[in-house]
Amino acid sequence: MASLMELVERVNKGEMIDPEPLEVYEESPNSAEKFLAHHAHSMIDLRRAHQHMVQCLEAIDYSDQKVLNQFVSISAFVGQADLRCGPMVKFGSCAINRREYGLGIEAIQNAVTYDLMHSGSYTRDRENCLLVAQQYERVAASIGWCNPHSSDWNHKLTRIAYVTSGLSDDDSTGRMIGSLARQYDSNRFKLNVYSTECGVRRERQSFAQNTYGIPSSKRGKDTLEMLNRMKVTAWMTPLDGETIAAAKALADQLVRDQIDVILFDCTQADSIAALCAMWDVARAKVNLCRRTPMYSSGLQCICYFDQGRFENDREFWSRRGVDSKYILEGVDLEETITAAPNRSAYGIPESAVVMTSSGSDLDRTMSDEFCDTLINILRSHPQSIYLCVGEGELSAQKRKFESAGVGKRVGYAGKRKDLPGFLRMADLYLAEFPSCDPAGVLQAMSVERPVVAMRWGEAPEQSAGSAFAGPEATISGRDSTTYIERVSKLIREPGSRKQLGKSMRERVEQQFAFTQTTRHLEQLCEQILQGRTGGSSDQMITEGSEPLAEVA
């Protein structure tokens, strides 16, 4: 007979076991055993109820919002959040069939936002994303918005609209907007910035969202002030109407401003941007893809900032006749970098050697191989400390560090708005393997932090970090022993750390500055327009998936 802890562990892993063995422990005089047995039994019953709720929704063709909300609540409670997105998208699709367009797209936005926020499986499936795009396109066609003017305007300066889901001083989009505003060629282009405010609570909403963001006027106050100084117009959708009214307002504003090229820095979680991407609001439309594309048929080009995702998707876009590009998002060396934080404020001794890694998906990049290597390093160097910076639950990694006896020397800083300045507190940057977040590597290099990277393979996601850091900071092949030796050498030798850090900064200045990113984006806008307006063949985009910027 299985022990209580074995049964509880199986239930926690999501197994649907027979609850009969738990009944023995439910009558135990030991209060702890009684609690665990009843809790495990209740989780089994809830999972069964969850399955019945799915069948209930299917029986009524996903038409009852109250039942859907009950299903969502149970999904969250039993830890099966991955299963909530599909039924919610089906609910939205059925609402669209009933011509309840606002309810439909807001339900779909809720589902996609949650899935992306929790790195769910639904949006990792391209077929699901195409289904979502199809629903947005149905609404865009049914609403009946049309451009009362011809979009074939011709200006001396090419007018570029940067459309984002929200302005924030502490995220990558906000930093990119600020960098573009400082570095774009104002003699050839005119830049306008638009925020859909899709995540902000509106006065009229048909379907509540999971969470609501702060309006850009508050969250992006510094960015808006900077744009005003740079004479870049910023416009935000009004919040006094519902989602469809906001989409129409944005479309009307884009037409009034006679925009030539729109850069949508958005995902499918932005229903307002998805509708505008389908309407004739500009001469050309480009999706800047950080995570997943918008998959809208109204786009002329998908521009990736992640080379691995670009390589995975390029054949798909080629088959659909859509241009796809990869552009490196460099580091803005003109951006004001905050001073290094005081170590004592974080309980870190001044004599400690601080190692760090940064990323937007640490659960994925902090692999078992990397954690085992890190444990070896921490055991060999008692004065060393490791600091995780970025997003991720890291529950499995925390258990691994605790069981290895180094848990007290591993810190978790979470998502920081003061990057890359926060990385100055570290002495050494460790690029995770097999894959890492290349943005973290570049940020560390920009503040003169020495980097150690491993080229795990030739795939872009396994070699991006080493490609940025260069051969001087790279371990060739899957050699954890050499990686540990290199890190140990840098821990022991402050002079070597300082020298390598300077060379990292020089490498960024020479090859990975944001100035190059700006020039490539300007080039992309010109090529897209020339391709649409019949420019000369040598200037047109003739190869659908050719990267504009290669990593040296």
Language-model-detected regions and their locations in the chain:
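Conserved catalytic-core segment of nucleotide-activated headgroup transferases in glycan assembly
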Residues: 171-183, 319-404, 412
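Catalytic binding pocket for nucleotide-activated donors in carbohydrate/polymer assembly enzymes
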Residues: 432-494, 498, 507
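Short acidic alpha-helix that forms the nucleotide-activated donor recognition element
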Residues: 251-252, 256, 415-426, 442, ...
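A charged, aromatic-enriched C-terminal amphipathic alpha-helix characteristic of glycosyltransferases
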Residues: 341, 492-530
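Conserved active-site histidine-acidic residue motif and adjacent donor-binding/catalytic loop
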Residues: 239-247, 391-395, 407-423, 436-437
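N-terminal subdomain of nucleotide-sugar transferases
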Residues: 2-29, 35-40, 50, 57-58, ...
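C-terminal alpha-helical cap of glycosyltransferases
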Residues: 514-552
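Acidic donor-binding loop of glycosyltransferase active sites
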Residues: 257-261, 424-437, 449
